[in-house]
């Protein structure tokens, strides 16, 4: 709606201007401070200029009023125009807030957890954010592809195989074993050990077979990770292997050398990242000739940046913050614009239950399993809470609040608004088609404000995507639900003289809730279950 109004205003003003959303919708739906920016050029007061501009909008069909207030130009949209927008939305509900196809393209790499165990709650935040960003981008018309980078070549994979081998020796063959300082533990390792022993037999379990054992376990873990993601309604387009990039390492090193991005010292090859803003240079090839994790990651990012996407986005854990300058430095040395590599950081999550820290899973070792939380509160509640705060801020929540059936549970509260609307339609014995002819002229000021809020969803979605601030969507839904409940409690609907106008208004509110929830990966309920 905002873009439509902007274009209507621009037809009259014929210049560039900023269009703002005043908090008090009783004053105006939209406002522009244009008069202030013209004051110096025209050598007139902002109030005089605003009054002059307001006079140009007399008898405009879109606006109920256009007023000059303290130098601002305030616009109130007419009921007739709001009704036209409502009719468009209700006639084509599947296209409500959808954007036209755009030329911009994105590649999002996210989750990319080591395939050495099940996903934990820390992985879940970035996973939910990335999946919602994907849904939103595609809804708005962008080409948006997703990818999972499988770290299948490093020491972590070897440790997975070693951990299983030691578990077999200790728990099945009853041998005395000495565990290294770093290894994987938890019931899932014992389960893998048991399954591997049944599959391969006793003779297989020797050090020379650790790589084969690790590969087998890695594949099992990838299947489990995909299941964990699907449980939370997350699907990633493609999975790419770290190993598949090793053959391209030499060519990448040559390119870096050509651009003076690397040098040799102390028998190692260093990335000269301090030249590009990093705090120090980084080793990419060790003394023994083995590449570091950074080396493989540079090759992978070089490939991503070469595929023709307008922007490559990564979602990383907040502990990778220091990794950003070195990766951007490498991309600049390779001739790419590092601004086209965008990094979103997912901060830590603290989980409580009844006010106490949530118990760690014995199955996972010392982590809270993502699947355990989904089993307990459902994927809808999990997704909502992870989207409720900016991704790069610490999140603490008590899962007990998400099991309550009252206003303290935002998922319940918003769903109750949606279900309540269906209940009102049922009580009135009507369907949406029965109220499409309503013209909304009888709506009071609160009703108009609620209608405006419901129709303003697309502006919220655009802002949320452009700022990567997905918390704007649940914030919007909470406010919309609160305003709906308040309006419902203050106005008689069924049997009132303006029943059809109110039902049409409510149908717009329901459509906005359903659309926004769908983009969050949440199902809007038509009926509340108790």
From Swiss-Prot:
Enzyme Commission code: 6.1.1.19
Source taxon at top rank: Bacteria
Record has Cytoplasm as a keyword: yes
PROSITE patterns cross-referenced by the UniProt entry: AA_TRNA_LIGASE_I
Keywords: Aminoacyl-tRNA synthetase, ATP-binding, Cytoplasm, Ligase, Nucleotide-binding, Protein biosynthesis
Pfam families to which the protein is assigned, alphabetical: Arg_tRNA_synt_N (PF03485), DALR_1 (PF05746), tRNA-synt_1d (PF00750)
Motif mapping: 'HIGH' region: 113-123
Recorded GO CC terms: cytoplasm
GO molecular function: arginine-tRNA ligase activity; ATP binding
Keyword Lipid metabolism applies: no
Primary location class: cytoplasm
Biological processes annotated in GO: arginyl-tRNA aminoacylation
Catalytic reaction(s) noted: tRNA(Arg) + L-arginine + ATP = L-arginyl-tRNA(Arg) + AMP + diphosphate
InterPro entries per the UniProt record, alphabetical: aa-tRNA-synth_I_CS (IPR001412), Arg-tRNA-ligase (IPR001278), Arg-tRNA-synth_N (IPR005148), Arg-tRNA-synth_N_sf (IPR036695), ArgRS_core (IPR035684), DALR_anticod-bd (IPR008909), Rossmann-like_a/b/a_fold (IPR014729), tRNAsynth_Ia_anticodon-bd (IPR009080)
UniProt enzyme class: ligase
Compartment(s): Cytoplasm
Subunit structure as annotated in this protein's UniProt entry: Monomer.
Family from the record: Belongs to the class-I aminoacyl-tRNA synthetase family.
Name under which the protein is recorded: Arginine--tRNA ligase
Organism, as annotated: Campylobacter jejuni subsp. doylei (strain ATCC BAA-1458 / RM4099 / 269.97)
Organism ancestry: Bacteria, Pseudomonadati, Campylobacterota, Epsilonproteobacteria, Campylobacterales
